[in-house]
């Protein structure tokens, strides 16, 4: 079985910062209320950039990090719930933008677990020998599917993109993988598509925004975060003490805090940047992982856990060996 290396990482967030004070001007909320309940201080909002554009910029940064050319890429997988179009896929648009002439391209929809799923898919293709170089991307323009009068959701999300280059190599980056789904709780986090009965009715389109049962999602997220950490460690017979960082989906500080208490681990073991970006869904763990590498917070031989969970409901994680 072929070994899989994480050859490069890249991310991109739009320059426009929308902080909590800005939000207080458009919805009934304030900075203290948001920070106390979520840990979020600000988020990035796209101004004219669509998902494919941000995905392209993250991809270019990952390619530079990996020192590869676009024509080397065999597969592009884009995880997103906010594509530019139904057709063509965001992955095909990225292919055109970066001129990856040899790549097979497709999108996947797994919400906040999306990049985990994409990395899992890419890893399996490389291990099987089908492809040698895979570009996995998580990218979202969540600002376009939010109800900006609903303070229970609009305060949580931001826009951004993250990318990783996986390639066949001499060392193993992906020590273990874990994914799962719970469609039985899917109604806890939804965003309707075009209505079947009358797709031309403007009022129906206005209903295509995110709605969330916050309590149900919170309970699910804490449970799954703890479960995923334990399962990934058990598979490789690794202890929490051997983990340099746990990089969780950046949804809510309280979720991470509760999970840390259950796992009996210091909160500092978790890498957290949600205060700056909010919940960027599929891009979340990738932006954080890229930061950890760029800041030189890890070195060769360190082990890192990344855990995703979100709409679907979906979840998953990876145990990464830094090479």
UniProtKB/Swiss-Prot annotation:
GO CC terms, sorted: cytoplasm
Key words, A-Z: Acyltransferase, Cytoplasm, Fatty acid biosynthesis, Fatty acid metabolism, Lipid biosynthesis, Lipid metabolism, Multifunctional enzyme, Transferase
GO biological process: fatty acid biosynthetic process; secondary metabolite biosynthetic process
Catalytic activity: malonyl-[ACP] + acetyl-CoA + H(+) = 3-oxobutanoyl-[ACP] + CO2 + CoA
Subcellular location per the Swiss-Prot or TrEMBL entry: Cytoplasm
Enzyme active site: 112, 249, 279
Domain of life: Bacteria
Pathway(s) it belongs to: Lipid metabolism; fatty acid biosynthesis
Enzyme Commission number: 2.3.1.180
Subunit organization: Homodimer.
HAMAP family: FabH
Family (UniProt): Belongs to the thiolase-like superfamily. FabH family.
UniProt-recorded name of the protein: Beta-ketoacyl-[acyl-carrier-protein] synthase III
Gene source species: Clostridium kluyveri (strain ATCC 8527 / DSM 555 / NBRC 12016 / NCIMB 10680 / K1)
Lineage of source species: Bacteria, Bacillati, Bacillota, Clostridia, Eubacteriales
Gene name tied to this protein: fabH
């Amino acid at each position: 079985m072929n070994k899989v290396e994480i050859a490069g990482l890249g991310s991109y967030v739009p320059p426009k910062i929308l902080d909590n004070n800005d939000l207080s001007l458009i919805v009934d909320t304030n900075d203290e209320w948001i920070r106390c309940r979520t840990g979020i201080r600000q988020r990035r909002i796209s101004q004219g950039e669509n998902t494919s554009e941000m995905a392209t910029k993250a991809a270019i940064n990952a390619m530079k990090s990996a020192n590869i050319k676009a024509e080397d890429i065999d597969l592009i997988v884009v995880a997103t719930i906010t594509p530019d179009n139904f057709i063509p896929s965001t992955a095909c648009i990225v292919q055109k933008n970066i001129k990856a002439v040899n790549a097979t391209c497709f999108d996947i929809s797994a919400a906040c677990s999306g990049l985990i799923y994409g990395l899992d898919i890419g890893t399996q293709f490389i291990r099987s020998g089908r492809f040698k170089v895979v570009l996995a991307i998580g990218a979202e323009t969540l600002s376009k599917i939010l109800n900006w009068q609903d303070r229970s959701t609009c305060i949580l999300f931001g826009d951004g993109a993250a990318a990783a280059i996986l390639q066949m190599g001499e060392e193993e980056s992906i020590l273990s993988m874990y994914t799962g789904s719970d469609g039985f709780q899917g109604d806890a986090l939804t965003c309707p598509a075009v209505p079947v009965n009358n797709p031309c009715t403007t009022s129906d389109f206005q209903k295509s925004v995110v709605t969330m049962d916050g309590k149900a999602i919170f309970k699910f997220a804490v449970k799954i975060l703890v479960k995923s950490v334990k399962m990934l460690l058990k598979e490789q017979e690794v202890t929490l003490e051997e983990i340099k960082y746990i990089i969780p989906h950046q949804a809510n500080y309280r979720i991470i805090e509760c999970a840390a208490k259950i796992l009996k681990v210091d909160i500092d073991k978790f890498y957290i940047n949600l205060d700056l970006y909010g919940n960027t869904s599929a891009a979340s763990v990738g932006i954080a992982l890229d930061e950890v590498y760029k800041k030189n917070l890890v070195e060769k031989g360190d082990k890192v856990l990344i855990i995703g969970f979100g709409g679907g409901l979906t979840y998953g994680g990876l145990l990464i060996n830094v090479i």
